[in-house]
């Protein structure tokens, strides 16, 4: 007998191969198509009445309705879970939906969250204002002050929430230390890895329990598609924690199932799909899932170029007489930031960052208005270079004190460095500096 040939599923594939093949290791079984098909359907035919009853009764796994599952989305979920090193994933209609569902799956009325201050403005508003109306409060802390983080945890705290790279200044947090604090208090560490990407860092390997992404950013990569995804690390013991009855006790709206018992390591995303997505419906469309799969296929290639260009822009800005300060971990004056950057981002990172121009908000806006190659818009992580004035746009809903808490000044300019030729990027920046001298 010949030697057993391993299948793709049996092999330990590298990241660049995983991003191309997971979920569709073989061509489509019906059509032999190599590309993942777009299953543009709202619903699925049952073979007979018993088959329908078994699907609804959870005795037969499979598709029931497009709000909950879709074959195209399933492949995207399998692939991003593999890239992040998780056990399961759930794709949803936006990054905001991913964060909201994650918090709603952990915290109920009367509960509490501890969150880093340096987070996306939309998430800050969700935690500081919107969820308060539903009985969930948040304490915002300096994620670099570990004593402050631990001191903010209460008996009713249900999670510690951070971002891999802070928004908008790309500060690096100590994931391992924060995970240790969260686990000491029997709560999960939730991390937004949108800016980090699984190509540069896999937070689950450092102790994070749940990872969220705005897939709109690096995953999609081209500024065309809105979506989000939640990845379940599968390592948090919900039963041992004793703080999450919604995951461990029988659910009256779903056949009395205990998600921790029924879904095991994938309990967290399974409950979101079965309850929150079922009832509130922030579903990702199959076409968007297909576009995100296209994005994943080139993720490593694009991110390498993003990072390479960004580090050259940082070096350029550091030498500019009109620049007061560059906020990027690679040039931070804080030795702890330098240490964390080298530890968590050995291959570089932070293609979205800010700098402070000498002058006021008018000088910052004048500089932005003279840029030609950079697009002035609210997105980030596009292959095209982007720019915005956070104080008057993305963080305008925050008061001056809240902006200062997040490291945003009137003269702060946020850049998202694209994949254009670096000479063209630097030329555009230099032209704008020359125009506002």
How would you name each of these model-derived features?
Residues 1-6, 128-129, 137, 155, ...:
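PLP-dependent enzyme catalytic core of the Aspartate aminotransferase-like
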Residues 7-11, 23-27, 89-319, 327:
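Conserved PLP-enzyme active-site core in the AAT-like
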Residues 231, 354-356, 416-418:
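Short hydrophobic/aromatic beta-strand micro-patches
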Residues 1-60:
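N-terminal glycine-rich, Lys/His-bearing helix-loop that initiates the first secondary-structure elements
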Residues 280-283, 287-289, 294, 298, ...:
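Conserved small-domain helix->loop->beta segment predominantly found in fold-type I
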Residues 27, 45-49, 237-238, 299, ...:
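Short, acidic Gly/Pro/Ser/Thr-rich loop/turn segments
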Residues 48-97, 122-129:
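Conserved N-terminal alpha-helix of the aminotransferase class I/II PLP-enzyme fold
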Residues 22-24, 40-44, 67-69, 357, ...:
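Pocket-edge structural micro-motifs
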């Amino acid at each position: 007998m010949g030697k057993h040939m391993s299948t793709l599923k049996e092999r330990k594939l590298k990241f660049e191969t995983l991003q191309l093949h997971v979920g569709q290791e073989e061509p489509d079984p019906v059509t032999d198509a190599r590309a993942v098909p777009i299953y543009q359907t709202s619903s699925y035919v049952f073979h007979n009445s018993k088959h329908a009853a078994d699907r609804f009764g959870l005795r037969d796994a499979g598709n029931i309705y497009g709000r909950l599952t879709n074959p195209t989305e399933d492949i995207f979920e399998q692939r991003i879970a593999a890239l992040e090193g998780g056990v399961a994933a759930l794709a949803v209609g936006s990054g905001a939906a991913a964060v909201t569902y994650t918090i709603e799956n952990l915290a109920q009325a009367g509960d509490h969250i501890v969150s880093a201050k340096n987070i996306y403005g939309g998430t800050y508003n969700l935690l500081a204002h919107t969820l308060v109306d539903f009985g969930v409060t948040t304490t915002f802390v300096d994620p670099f002050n570990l004593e402050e983080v631990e001191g903010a945890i209460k008996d009713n705290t249900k999670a510690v929430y951070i971002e891999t790279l802070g928004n908008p200044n790309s500060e690096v947090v100590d994931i391992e230390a924060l995970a240790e604090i969260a686990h000491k208090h029997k709560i999960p560490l939730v991390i937004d890895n949108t800016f980090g990407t699984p190509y540069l860092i896999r937070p689950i390997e450092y102790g994070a329990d749940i990872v969220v992404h705005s897939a709109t950013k690096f995953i999609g990569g081209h500024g065309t598609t809105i979506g989000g995804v939640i990845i379940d690390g599968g390592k948090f013991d919900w039963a041992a924690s004793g703080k999450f009855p919604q995951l461990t006790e029988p659910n009256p709206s779903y056949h009395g199932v205990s998600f921790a018992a029924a879904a095991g390591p994938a309990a967290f995303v399974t409950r979101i799909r079965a309850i929150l997505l079922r009832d509130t419906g922030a579903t990702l469309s199959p076409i968007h899932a297909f576009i995100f799969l296209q994005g994943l296929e080139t993720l490593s290639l694009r991110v390498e170029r993003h990072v390479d260009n960004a580090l050259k822009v940082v070096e350029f800005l550091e030498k500019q007489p009109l620049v007061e300060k560059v906020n990027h971990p690679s040039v931070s004056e804080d030795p702890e930031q330098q240490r964390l950057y080298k530890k968590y981002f050995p291959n570089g990172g932070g293609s979205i960052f800010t700098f402070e121009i000498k002058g006021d908000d008018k000088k910052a806006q004048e500089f932005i208005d003279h840029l030609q190659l950079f697009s002035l818009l609210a997105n980030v992580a596009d292959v095209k270079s982007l720019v915005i004035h956070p104080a008057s746009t993305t963080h305008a809903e925050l008061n001056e004190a809240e902006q200062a808490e997040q490291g945003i000044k009137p003269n702060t300019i946020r850049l998202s460095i694209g994949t254009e030729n670096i000479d063209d990027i630097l030329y555009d920046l230099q032209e704008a500096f020359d125009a506002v001298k």
